Amino acid sequence: MSSRSHAIDLPHELRQRLSGYRWHRQTIGRSQAGVFRLVADGKPALFLKCERSGPFAELADEAARLRWLAGQGIACPDVIALESHAGHDWLLMSAVAGEDLASAAIEPADVVGVMASALRGLHAIDIASCPFDHRLDQRIAAARARMEAGEVDESDFDDERQGWTAAEAFAGLLALRPATEDLVVTHGDACLPNVMAAEGRFSGFIDCGRLGVADRHQDLALACWSIRYNLGEAWIEPFLERYGPPETEPAKLSWYRLLDEFF
């Protein structure tokens, strides 16, 4: 679907910068922000995100994480501009080459191979270098804040939790909290649509607003869920085999899927 910028109250500098671009709204993914792909003859494609400003806005977080991630040598969008205007935040970024792994025309074995190697590379970064703390205490506190503010969409809960209230889900978070954390730098929303591939190879991470130091099961849980949804249950084990040790803990996979219901 195409959209025109004059229907949107853009910040002045962005309006000037984006003159002549054609706008196409993106519909894949679960981002709370409006996402547009911008194209113009003879110019590189860009992506623009827009969301309401407020205590649960994430675009400033995403910009900070993209800048940090690029500094670690991991492919991701370049931050071109971050603006606030008329009660909204705007993030303009470069496009990453290729297609996301949920859409790429490659075989399932290659999809899980790219996903595994991409996460393995991210998880190899020294956590001491990462300023974004997503350990259990911080994420449980964030989940509580979102619940108390009415920001949790109970209608979007996974099938096994349909009919639950956010309070019931939060009680489960507390009761089943993991006793240990195997800390790495995690993407935070490691689903197939957030990993890009070009010519069958990893080309970058996108939607990085929840990147931070957390248990590796944060990423493995969402990756397994996404692989099941997009490719089928049979491809989870090949993905985990390609990812390699340490062995995954089913209870942690389940807990981090529960945590994701709050975000």
Locate the predicted segments by residue.
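Conserved N-terminal boundary motif of the eukaryotic protein kinase catalytic domain
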Residues: 17-26
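A cross-family signal for key residues in well-ordered alpha-helices
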Residues: 67-70, 224, 257
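An alpha-helical support segment within catalytic cores of ATP-dependent transferases
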Residues: 5-16, 121-188, 246-249
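Short, surface-exposed alpha-helical segments at coil->helix boundaries
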Residues: 7-8, 63, 233, 237
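Active-site Asp-x-Gly
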Residues: 56, 136, 182-185, 198-254, ...
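Active-site acidic catalytic loop and adjacent metal/ATP-binding pocket
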Residues: 29-42, 46-48, 79, 168-218
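ATP-binding pocket architecture of kinase catalytic cores
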Residues: 25-132, 180
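Localized chelating/binding microdomains
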Residues: 111, 213, 260
